[in-house]
Amino acid sequence: MRKTYINGLGCISVQETFDTIFLEKAEINENDTILPVKTPVYKDFISPVAIRRMAKGVKNGIVASAMAMKEANVSTVDAIITGTGMGCIEDSEKFLKAIIDNKEEFLTPTSFIQSTHNTVGAQIALGLQCKAYNLTYVNGSISFESALLDAKMKIEEEEANIILVGGIDENADYTTSLFKLAGFIKRENEGPYKVLNATTKGAVYGEGATFFVLENEKKSTTYAEILDVEIINKLDVNEVESKCSAFLEANGLQVSDIDTIVLGFNGDVEFDPYYKILSENSFKNTPQAFYKQLSGEYNTASAFGLWVGAKIIKTQEVPEIISVNNLEKPAYKTILLYNQYKGIDHSFTLISKC
């Protein structure tokens, strides 16, 4: 069975994760409940004519994918697989608002055409003139992991050699207001909004696009090997440790073999115990990292988490800004990532140095 290597990365997020090495310009914002994306210079990647018609999620996805392909030194791919929770929600809102404002008459189709969840994958394919396998997974907070698992299986089964995989989500005003009403987002005027040891419900929300070029061959640009991905729909808090141990054992590993665990803490006091049980028990003597204090919470934030894990292996450091317990190891070879959202859609991802 062939191996799967991460050979290129591209990340557009609420931090300056482009034109940097690894979070040296990152800042923690504990005052706002919604974190806007930091945008690159779009016209360096997309023609100004096309930019006008694109929502930010589409633009960010195109730029992040271009960065990943440039780093991996590839010009075409055998498959494009994306994951998104809310899709191009900004254009969906525009179209629905136009229906109401115009009383269902004289509607322009642009926002409707651009509002589908697979718009990002389609626009990337159009730009590359790529007519290969193109699939978008819309599966809540495991949308990205579903795409990653599909890509890994295609490489293992020798159905593709080079695959572009990404996770994309964007914020939109009306949807955000609904999330606030539902209690998904932290209440205003309750800051500072700390992620670790939080005492309130909800999370600080963000947005972003993170892409990876996966190949079956190791290259000079290789970050890490993807060893395994597992998705579990529902778990009780007291089941997490046993499921984690079983996942490691299936890969011939033990807790002591993990050099860093990357956890998806988001500051929701109701559901962060899923992470705490690993942090305070099985992995209490293991270096721990967290990332949603930088990225914010969104359906495909775990793609940002994988970007963090890959960078740790490449740079052989865990920056202080993402360290949970300030423990260190002389080398970071094997990293475990764990994420969940509101107690469902749990994922374990295992990567290693090649």
Regions found by a protein language model. Give the residues of each.
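Catalytic nucleophile serine of serine hydrolases
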Residues: 140-143
